[in-house]
Amino acid sequence: MSRIRAVLFDFGGVFTPSPFDGARNYGAQIGASPERVLELVFGPYHEDTDHPWHRLERGEMALVDARNAIVELGRAEGVDADPFKLFASMANGPRGAYDAMIARARAVVGRGYRTALVTNNVVEFRESWRKMLPADELFQVVVDSSEVRMRKPNPAIFRHTLALLGDVAPEECLFLDDAASNVEAAEKLGIRGVLVKSDLADALAALDALL
């Protein structure tokens, strides 16, 4: 087995509360099916489709237009699938556990590993999410889906990240993400994957064991 030389991190659900958990919790709050709200807002996340949220994450659509389209999808089913309300419902969540992941990423950098952030994200969120963690300190490479016009689980975004990192093979990389489909996509390329759950404990232990 190849020695790990680079660690790739997702953002949401790894350094911040998972938007997937947020969607499920929001669905429960409004009396709708949590899984249906998740799919209405974020689309079939195991795929890369033309759902409004996927187009938004590829930088093909403005946030306000994607939000309006998703609200209409929900309205057709009698569900208030408003992404803005979903994210507002997450605003006061805990941060302590995620500070532990930031500390672990800092330790990874200190041990000489190459690091990258590979995030499905939104142009309009760029300023706010970059204030949540010291990206320039923690990552040699930042790959934002809305900038590179491709999103996980498309394998092209992983190939692009490895090209930016330089002389590193997929088998020498470890990837942490809270979406199983993204982890599986990375693993198909030979990257070792760690699925991050909401309490982070298993992911932190796996990270320690593999490095």
Can you say where each PLM-predicted feature lies in the sequence?
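Short glycine/serine/threonine/alanine-rich loop segments
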Residues: A32, Y113, I191
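Asp-based, Mg2+/Mn2+-dependent phosphohydrolase catalytic module
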Residues: M1-F9, V109, V118, V122-V123, ...
